[in-house]
Swiss-Prot record:
Belongs to the RelA/SpoT family. It comes from the Bacteria. Pfam families: ACT_4, HD_4, RelA_AH_RIS, RelA_SpoT, TGS. Residues 45-144 form the HD domain. Residues 587-613 are annotated as: Disordered. The gene is rsh. GO terms for biological process: guanosine tetraphosphate metabolic process; response to starvation. PROSITE patterns: ACT, HD, TGS. Residues 676-750 form the ACT domain. This is GTP pyrophosphokinase rsh. GO terms for cellular component: plasma membrane.
Amino acid sequence: MMRQYELVERVQRYKPDVNEALLNKAYVYAMQKHGSQKRASGDPYFSHPLEVAAILTDMHLDEATIAIALLHDTIEDTTATRQEIDQLFGPEIGKLVEGLTKLKKLDLVSKKAVQAENLRKLLLAISEDVRVLLVKLADRLHNMRTLGVMREDKRLRIAEETMDIYAPLAGRMGMQDMREELEELAFRYINPDAWRAVTDRLAELLEKNRGLLQKIETDLSEIFEKNGIKASVKSRQKKPWSVFRKMETKGLSFEQLSDIFGFRVMVDTVQDCYRALGLIHTTWSMVPGRFKDYISTPKQNDYRSIHTTIIGPSRQRIELQIRTREMDEIAEFGVAAHSIYKDRGSANNPHKISTETNAYAWLRQTIEQLSEGDNPEEFLEHTKLELFQDQVFCFTPKGRLIALPRGATPIDFAYAVHTDIGDSCVGAKVNGRIMPLMTELKNGDEVDIIRSKAQVPPAAWESLVATGKARAAIRRATRSAVRKQYSGLGMRILERAFERAGKPFSKDILKPGLPRLARKDVEDVLAAVGRGELPSTDVVKAVYPDYQDTRVTTQNNPAKAGEKGWFNIQNAAGMIFKVPEGGEGAAAKVDPAATTPKPGKRALPIRGTNPDLPVRFAPEGAVPGDRIVGILQPGAGITIYPIQSPALTAYDDQPERWIDVRWDIDDQMSERFPARISVSAINSPGSLAEIAQIAAANDANIHNLSMVRTAPDFTEMIIDVEVWDLKHLNRIISQLKESASVSSAKRVNG
């Protein structure tokens, strides 16, 4: 266990003017308070806050943060009080220690709710001071390092919580090394067999390639030294969780992975980053499509680096990251590292510096949005979503900021503002221009929702939205509209039925008959009659028990099969009732489900089109799973486009021609759909055969292949394939990208 003077010395190495008195007092106080307490492992409990403090010294944090780490469990697990800590260490440290205290005594309905409330308190505390986050992550990291002594069920619960919340939170805040270690430790307990298998394979691969990695490292170092660039080069290997996740999400085998090894180049200045990049690209061939400049355009979590991929000496792909040493420290420690470079020579606290970073700004915005909810379990699920997905930020005409997931549409925006606005939405202006409701919103868009009181959200909207709130509201509104429709039809049916029976009718007259009909209210009766579940004669008899039905029934005068009544709904049971097409009460829209294909022609699996108009796919095609839209072509019917088609820009100013359509695929569908893939491959023997083998292994048919451009190192080609759906197409593209022969592969739209 680290001694008192050793802790002070660790901090002095990076902060010579350390407040030794504060560290010594916190060390002694925490040690005395925890006393003889033991951890599950049998170690003294004080060893835990001491290890948490040690993790934070590795991140070069100030003595106040180290003191908070030493004290973080005292209020929860000892006789220490907030008042006592305030008196000894000041109210600021007392407040942060209390912010780290778990909620064990809440009267909540489930373990999940307790977890959610703990997380809510943590996030709200983080929003006030980033040091709460740093201590909590270090606390979780040490607990994960010692998780093996716990019961199996507790290990699994803590590991899953770490993978779901703490690892992505560390990543969002730019603390990549901590994120990776948390993921690896969690992976080990969540799926031990997979962890062991991947770890063993990586060890074998490292041993096999050790000499090659050393050669590349030496070659790079010599090139930089020869050109006067002071650089350090080190090889790196993907972590087991990263490898396993890629295999799972992209359907790849271990052998198909081609970027397990990479190199990190660290230099002194930004200018040296670009000089090093130029030397690398003039020495080796660059792989097209694999260059990313995060220095000129940093990531949301402040990560900055240049990424490029080259063809190495043995014609293998090698990924390189080029960054300054300052960028490397920020990539490793995230928000914590900003104090090292922005606070040198200053009396400011690191947490004040950290609140200026992009990553911390994101966290505050997320917390503001999430803290509005009251349901703790819903809060937990929403938090997980927010941690894992990118966001777009749009504005109302009055300047209110609305945060939405990437891929959101104006419909999502409308429901995010208010459910009533979503339900009454009929159109949208995006940046002053009327745009289709399926338009994907971008950062900074100003969205003005056009409303109508007569609007009812169509069920087809479900396929256009990206948020759970919008989807749930659409379902609720759709159910309500359908019930209202059936209720109106039931009202008309009963009016006619009571008229034929010679009995007076009103809604109030139905109330005495509710017990006999076993219905809860009058609206339930009307809807049941409208749906055909309840014969109108049963209702008349329930209200007037002495009534004798003398009408002609369907048994002696059957209706024609498939006849429709009002609202295009099948006639109610017990009555022959038909309204002619186009007559009073006829449906305003054609039921797409009733469309019957003409003999000899295959019906397109599309819903939402008029059966009287011809429908065709655009030249670039669309596959099931694509978000699609129909464009009305005067005199030529409807053309179906994938929503990402560049050709749709020609119709931006003609929203009246856009038609909401969706796929209508059933399990018996055996149709394949054409798609086009652009591939850039290494120009070497066997490359084409490997590409064809990937298509064949995935049960895809290549029906055309054309070479676009050929160079000594690379060749570009267009491949036309036939696939079942978007998932099938994406799997093929993913495996092409992972092939050692392929430098890039992407779908062609238009």
